[in-house]
């Protein structure tokens, strides 16, 4: 019987059990590999970041900026597996990409399968421009200032290391800037990427220790992080230069 995503709709800190996280990792793999042909490495790179962003819970939304679900698709903060965020970030001035796209296509924003589909649209201007006419508001953005690779190359790359896969996903899909702030535990993303990759291949790895995101997990605390703290205005914009 096909697996189905487990979700809990709730604000920051709404976590899943380890068994449910593992189930969702397999669901992500089934979608991105089985339906869209992504490489195992590319999916693992994304999953490493998903743990730190959402704890693999497609129903989580960020509450630290005062957002509620009463005015969707407008929401100031991150939502879903990849924590799609409104732009300018946290302002609530424009729709959040995830509920905007889901409502346009007739899906619930917390639908994990739909979120996997939306990831495949990271360079499709029909989705990334959101009909606003001001250019991409989210998506895969490359730059000479940080590690970059074309999206189509990334999703089919089966020779890159898990660290490289996490690096490309973090910079090109999520962060869009060349410095990593102190509060980002990049090494946790690499560990969870390897964990997901091992699950894909039938192993039973021990869960890495918890990072700063909502996902639970036994083990030691976060390792030291890399990079410098960004000025506040850059944290809010997160755009390439």
Language-model segments: which ranges?
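GSAT-biased (Gly/Ser/Ala/Thr-rich) low-complexity helical/flexible tracts used as stalks/linkers
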Residues: 2-12, 19-22, 197-217
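Enriched but not universal
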Residues: 1-5, 213-241
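Solvent-exposed, polar/charged alpha-helical surfaces in well-ordered, non-transmembrane soluble domains
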Residues: 26-30, 34, 44-47, 117, ...
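Membrane-interface starts of transmembrane alpha-helices
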Residues: 39-43
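Surface-exposed polar/charged interaction patches
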Residues: 35, 199-203, 239
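Generic alpha-helical structural context detector
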Residues: 47-51, 167, 171, 210-218
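Peptidoglycan-targeting cell-wall enzymes and recognition modules
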Residues: 3-27, 31, 35, 51-161
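Active-site or metal-binding loop neighborhoods of secreted/extracellular toxin and effector enzymes
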Residues: 150-208
